[in-house]
Structure formats: structure tokens, C-alpha cells
Amino acid sequence: MKIRYFITLVACLFCIATFAQKKNQTSETEFRAKQQTYMSQKAGLTQEESKQFFPLYFEFQDKKKEINKEAWEIAKQGKNPDTTEAEYEKIIDTFFDNQETIAKMEKEYIKKYREFLSNKKIYMVYWAERKFSRNMLKILQEMDDKEKK
């Protein structure tokens, strides 16, 4: 269940960043600045905590993005109608192996966060991240609905 939720969250974040950039020409820097401000406020991070947290957080996000990029490149092979069962097996195994790698890596980053943040603040940061993602999806959906009218 956790893996499914995690995969959904990662896919949403990746889509949000990509869609936001295309729709509004929002740069990754601008997107991250908005995300940082929102998460800092909602989690109640001090300026010092933010200075320590976000470089690590964005480092993790970049690594996660690269791992997911690899998984999606392999997954695209599945669109070919001539894909064999063995190739589908490789696609599935690679995807879930990558998710395991991300989960292990995230645990390592949480250890780093614990050096300067309480568990409560770590929880609050992750909660804020989820809320930010939902809010962005809602905004993007509203923009898409307006364009269709």
C-alpha cells in the first residue's frame, strides 16, 4: 500500500513540475521557490531549519527524478505492441526495483533530516508536501478546465 501511494505521489510531483513548466513557463527554480515557501510555512520551519533542510530535500528530489526518468524510459518500451513477456517482466522489475531504491534513499535522507529537525517537523514537512501537490493539481485542473471552455 505504501509503495502504491509513494509511486502515485512521485508521478504526481513529476507531472506537476512538468505541466506547470509547460503551461505557465514556470521554471524549476520558481516552482521550487513556491514549494519551499509553502512547505516552510505549513511545517513551521525556522529560517535556519529551512536553510539546512531544503538543499538536502532538493538533492533527494533530483536523485529521485533521475531514477524515475530511467524507469519511465524503460516503461515506454511497453507501448510497443511487439513487446515480449520477458521485456514486460524487465519493465515491471526495473520499475519496482527503482521504487525500492528510492524508498531506501529516502530513509537515508530522513536520517540526515533528523540531525536538525524533530520527527514532528519531518512529519509536518511531508504533510505540507502532500498538501502542496494536491493544491497544485487542483490549480492545474482548474486551468485546464478554463482552457477547454
Give the ranges of each region predicted by the language model.
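Amphipathic alpha-helical segments
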Residues: 35, 39-116
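A periodicity- and composition-biased signal for non-globular, repetitive helical segments
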Residues: 8-10, 41, 70, 127
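A short hydrophobic/aromatic micro-motif that marks alpha-helical segments and, especially, helix-coil
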Residues: 17-19, 61-64, 133-136
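Bacterial Sec-dependent N-terminal signal peptides
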Residues: 1-26
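Amphipathic, charged alpha-helical segments and their helix-to-coil junctions
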Residues: 59, 103, 107-149
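Short N-terminal segments immediately surrounding and downstream of signal-peptide cleavage
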Residues: 22-40
